[in-house]
Swiss-Prot record:
It comes from Sus scrofa (Pig). Keywords: Acetylation, Biological rhythms, Chromatin regulator, Cytoplasm, Glycoprotein, Glycosyltransferase, Lipid-binding, Nucleus, Phosphoprotein, Repeat, TPR repeat, Transferase, Ubl conjugation. It catalyses: L-seryl-[protein] + UDP-N-acetyl-alpha-D-glucosamine = 3-O-(N-acetyl-beta-D-glucosaminyl)-L-seryl-[protein] + UDP + H(+); L-threonyl-[protein] + UDP-N-acetyl-alpha-D-glucosamine = 3-O-(N-acetyl-beta-D-glucosaminyl)-L-threonyl-[protein] + UDP + H(+). GO terms for cellular component: cytosol; histone acetyltransferase complex; nucleus; plasma membrane. Ubiquitinated by the SCF(FBXO31) complex, leading to its proteasomal degradation. A motif (Nuclear localization signal) lies at residues 487-503. PROSITE patterns: TPR (PS50005), TPR_REGION (PS50293). This is UDP-N-acetylglucosamine--peptide N-acetylglucosaminyltransferase 110 kDa subunit. The modification Phosphothreonine is found at residue 454. Residues 991-1010 are annotated as: Required for phosphatidylinositol 3,4,5-triphosphate binding.
Length: 1046
């Protein structure tokens, strides 16, 4: 640090005062040089009060605060010095030091360079610049900085030696050799240069010259222990073990208890195959005082080979701490760190290994693998290519490069890499597993299953492949050996958690398996810690957070972070909320993690949020978090969790004082950096709060919300064409919906209004009834024209000037209406015949993805169908390859194939609308229908559910509780079956419940987005008031209910 107090400014004070000032300045400088920073600061402050514009005093204060790690104060005084003298190079250099310590290397480099422009002969500036450039990875720039320093003072032999070390690390051995020789020429007795020159000769294979220079170094400095060690090493390389032992024994004669020499002697024993003797000697070295990395590396290798990984790690750590120039130690230790999930440490070790040995293919590949985990995909790709350049048959590098390309959405490139890896090594299990992952993500589940099974044949103990295979089999409902598979999967997770490894079961999948709550939470915790590891490499200081609302005009700033602002179920649920916040009390920021998909969903959120920021254009998590923090966010909301597209690293950096999970992820984050999870009493009962790492923050009704009333207002009303059976008018055989439905009905003759009684609400279907009006179109020529349109597959017809469209043709008429981006403008006809559903049967449905079905669920459904003879189950081909498995298991349970009817997945609007055709939805207890539950309820179809132990298994019960339909919530499997059977056999009861759901979806809070937003605001204010009072996050389980008029 530049700390001069010379050039004291002119003064009109008496000479006596000047001498006093100068004397005090010299005293402060002596105290600074002696390391008595407290006294130096005290005297400097006296000087500063006398002459606040004295740049010498300002520089010394800057240096003192820097040494005391008070970087902000150091920068402050440097800045004051610059204001007094904008040409003061030392002040810019001091600022550069502050930036370098903060990890802001580019800013540091720019300040050093500015200092050098002001003072070209500023040698300390060049040295500082070189150090910053090395830290930034600009080795060539660092070399030039050292060269410039030496141009001004060629006799700086230490700097020249440092330059030699840098050149040696770059592999420019001849230039390094020249530096060391010049240093020796300047100072012939500089033993370090002799030893370093010996290292260069050793690297060049000049063994005897290396031996000579090490011996010269020892001659110049008989206490130069490292030179003895290097001499022993080079003799060991030459396999001259006797002389190597002699060199180490000579070192021991100088320092009998020196661990370095013991370690290197043990290394020779190891090379001779005397493993036990080597380990004993290594242990003796460690018992003394560890100083030599080779000994630790070799001991670690031996210990790891014997299964003593923890001890091996200790030895590698010591080697790294003392000498970061042992490539194998660095690489091997990095491997252990990566296995443990300590990503930052692994990266540092790999980089060090490559500094020492740039042509180290394995280190390139290993580093690339970790960089990929950190999201640094381009840099990872570069290292994989280097590994392959160095070793063209490096199958691991090809396979891992495929992983990177896959993450970069280059599916074809990834396929080529995996295929090449398998060509090089057909028995490469990891490559087969990686190839399977490509097939899995592409929806090609059968191919994925085949490749995972190949991987497991080649490598039976392969947890990742086994757990991914289990998930694939779950997706297609292949339940062969299901119980045994679940048992083994749980065992794998238990073993991985016990060994502190990243579990092979993803947090988002953990709900599907019979894991304990502790295991599920621990899986999430491991992934949360992985996020912390990824951001630790940024070395960012913690953010300072506001305690009041003064800087935001009294408004609470809420930031919603999501990769799903677009055509995604999450946006379908919450797209209206940003625009419904009270602008007088809330300022809404939406941070998109994905590019614009061009849909109206994206446009709506962009238009209605106060601020919309596309963070997908800021791939660096540190810079993205800076942006959030600069916006002064008070509450930052995580809408992704561990779903696709998440960037939890942003939250790990804590850019906001309060951070909450909400809506998009059905479980705990397990992360220390998430304060709250927004939930409700039914979904997350207080008695299971220990399942969550976050504090519970309750909404008064349900934490779930749907924007269905805004997206699908045409489904608020319906009319039916008269379909009589046993004297009943059915409301779900031929259904008409449309914004202009009333006007259309008014244009028709003979439309009947049938009054249907339904309960007023509550948990009893027999409570007081309200009449609902059901418009019924009689079977006349108009009805016949509509039916003929459906039967003939026509897209659209016109009746009385109104466009009547086939419900299967929405995409052809208006694609944005089909996706839910716009409200359809036609009258849409939906019929059971369109989907092959029987007209006279009870239709049970479930529109979830098939992975949510397990054997016990299908058995329960089969029992229901058996008890309701005239009934069918309507499922989706989601995916299609699951259909034959479901049919086969159902037949094994005694159900003929025609009792289960499959339909293709449909566009969003049709998906919601066709739910009207079912009589009852049977929920999946393993993992409920969340968005699909809202869809079917908006269609007016009752849903029977049975809450389980996980958040994901209790959402439907929360929705039904909010809807006021507690009679549809079962306590156990038998009750689930009984409720469903009663609905299927007691048609009057079914009509009442259907009427109740139809009415309650409008009158209850479930789809009331405005009221929900107000309740959410109240919860946000609770969080903020709790924080502003100086409290740590705590459970908020006494929600305040508000009404829309509040």
């Amino acid at each position: 640090m530049a700390s001069s107090v010379g050039n004291v400014a002119d003064s009109t004070e008496p000479t006596k005062r000047m001498l006093s000032f100068q004397g005090l300045a010299e005293l402060a400088h002596r105290e600074y040089q002696a390391g008595d920073f407290e006294a130096a600061e005290r005297h400097c402050m006296q000087l500063w009060r006398q002459e606040p514009d004295n740049t010498g005093v300002l520089l010394l204060l800057s240096s003192i605060h820097f040494q005391c790690r008070r970087l902000d104060r150091s920068a402050h005084f440097s800045t004051l010095a610059i204001k007094q003298n904008p040409l003061l190079a030392e002040a810019y250099s001091n600022l550069g030091n502050v930036y370098k310590e903060r990890g802001q290397l580019q800013e540091a480099i720019e300040h050093y360079r500015h200092a050098l422009r002001l003072k070209p002969d500023f040698i300390d500036g060049y040295i500082n610049l070189a150090a910053a450039l090395v830290a930034a990875g600009d080795m060539e720039g660092a070399v030039q900085a050292y060269v410039s320093a030496l141009q001004y003072n060629p006799d700086l032999y230490c700097v020249r030696s440092d330059l030699g070390n840098l050149l040696k690390a770059l592999g420019r051995l001849e230039e390094a050799k020249a530096c060391y020789l010049k240093a020796i020429e300047t100072q012939p007795n500089f033993a370090v240069a002799w030893s370093n020159l010996g290292c260069v000769f050793n690297a060049q294979g000049e063994i005897w010259l290396a031996i000579h220079h090490f011996e010269k170094a020892v001659t110049l400095d008989p206490n130069f222990l490292d030179a003895y060690i290097n001499l022993g090493n080079v003799l060991k390389e030459a396999r001259i073990f006797d002389r190597a032992v002699a060199a180490y024994l000579r070192a021991l004669s100088l320092s009998p208890n020196h661990a370095v020499v013991h370690g290197n002697l043990a290394c020779v024993y190891y090379e001779q195959g005397l493993i036990d003797l080597a380990i004993d000697t290594y242990r003796r070295a460690i018992e003394l005082q560890p100083h030599f990395p080779d000994a630790y590396c070799n001991l670690a290798n031996a210990l790891k080979e014997k299964g003593s990984v923890a001890e091996a790690e200790d030895c590698y750590n010591t080697a790294l701490r003392l000498c970061p120039t042992h490539a194998d130690s660095l690489n091997n230790l990095a491997n252990i760190k990566r296995e443990q999930g300590n990503i930052e440490e692994a990266v540092r070790l790999y980089r060090k290994a490559l500094e020492v040995f740039p042509e180290f293919a394995a280190a390139h590949s290993n580093l690339a693998s970790v960089l990929q985990q950190q999201g640094k995909l381009q840099e990872a790709l570069m290292h994989y290519k280097e590994a392959i350049r160095i070793s063209p048959t490096f199958a691991d590098a090809y396979s891992n490069m495929g992983n990177t390309l896959k993450e970069m959405q280059d599916v074809q490139g990834a396929l080529q890499c995996y295929t090449r890896a398998i060509q090089i090594n057909p028995a490469f299990a990891d490559a087969h597993s990686n190839l399977a992952s490509i097939h899995k993500d592409s929806g090609n589940i059968p191919e994925a299953i085949a490749s995972y099974r190949t991987a497991l044949k080649l490598k039976p103990d392969f947890p990742d492949a086994y757990c991914n295979l289990a998930h694939c089999l779950q997706i297609v409902c292949d339940w062969t050996d299901y119980d045994e598979r679940m048992k083994k999967l749980v065992s794998i997770v238990a073993d991985q958690l016990e060994k502190n490894r990243l579990p092979s079961v993803h947090p988002h999948h953990s709900m599907l398996y019979p894991l304990s709550h502790g295991f599920r939470k621990a899986i999430a915790e491991r992934h949360g810690n992985l996020c912390l590891d990824k951001i630790n490499v940024l070395h960012k200081p913690p953010y300072e957070h506001p305690k009041d609302l003064k800087l935001s005009d009294g408004r609470l700033r809420v930031g919603y972070v999501s990769s799903d602002f677009g055509n995604h179920p999450t946006s379908h649920l919450m797209q209206s909320i940003p625009g419904m916040h009270n602008p007088d009390k809330f300022e809404v920021f939406c941070y998109a993690l994905s590019p614009d998909d061009g849909t109206n969903f994206r446009v709506k959120v962009m238009a209605e949020a106060n601020h919309f920021i596309d963070l997908s254009q800021i791939p660096c998590n540190g810079k993205a978090a800076d942006r959030i923090h600069q916006d002064g966010i008070h509450i930052l909301v995580n809408m992704n969790g561990y779903t696709k597209g998440a960037r939890n690293e942003l939250f790990a950096l804590r850019p906001a004082p309060i951070q909450a999970m909400w809506l998009g992820y059905p479980g705990t984050s397990g992360a220390l950096f998430m304060d709250y999870i927004i939930t409700d009493q039914e979904t997350s009962p207080a008695e299971v709060a220990e399942q969550y790492s976050e504090k519970l923050a309750y909404m008064p009704h349900t934490f779930f919300i749907g924007d269905h009333a805004n997206m699908f207002p045409h489904l608020k009303k319906k009319a039916v064409i008269d379909f009589k059976s046993n004297g009943h008018i059915y409301d779900n055989r031929i259904v008409l919906n449309g914004i202009d439905l009333k006007a259309f009905l008014d244009s028709l003759p003979d439309v009947k209004i049938v009054k249907m009684k339904c309960p007023d609400g509550g948990d009893n279907a027999d409570s007081s009834n309200t009449a609902l009006n059901m418009p019924v179109i009689p079977m006349n020529t108009i009805a016949e024209a509509v039916i003929e349109m459906i039967n003939r597959g026509q897209i659209q017809i016109t009746i009385n000037g109104f466009s009547i469209s086939n419900g299967l043709a929405t995409t052809q008429i208006n694609n944005k209406a089909a996706t839910g981006e716009e409200v359809p403008r036609t009258i849409i006809v939906t019929t059971r015949s369109q989907y092959g559903l029987p007209e006279d049967a009870i239709v049970y449905c479930n529109f979830n993805q098939l992975y949510k079905i397990d054997p016990s669920t299908l058995q329960m459904w089969a029992n229901i169908l058996k008890r309701v003879p005239n009934s069918v189950l309507w499922l989706l081909r989601f995916p299609a390859v699951g259909e034959p498995n479901i049919q086969q298991y159902a037949q094994n349970m005694g159900l003929p194939q025609n009792r289960i009817i499959f339909s293709p997945v449909a566009p969003k609007e049709e998906h919601v609308r066709r739910g009207q055709l079912a009589d009852v939805c049977l929920d999946t207890p393993l993992c409920n229908g969340h968005t699909t539950g809202m869809d079917v309820l908006w269609a007016g179809t009752p849903m029977v559910t049975m809450p389980g132990e996980t958040l994901a298994s209790r959402v439907a019960a929360s929705q039904l509780t909010c809807l006021g339909c507690l009679e549809l919530i079962a306590k156990n499997r038998q009750e689930f079956e009984d409720i469903a059977v009663k609905l299927g056999t007691d048609l009057e009861y079914l009509k009442k419940i259907r009427g109740k759901v139809w009415k309650q979806r409008i009158s209850s809070p479930l789809f009331n987005t405005k009221q929900y937003t107000m309740e959410l605001e109240r919860l946000y204010l609770q969080m903020w008031e709790h924080y502003a009072a100086g409290n740590k996050p705590d459970h908020m389980i006494k929600p305040v209910e508000v009404t829309e008029s509040a």
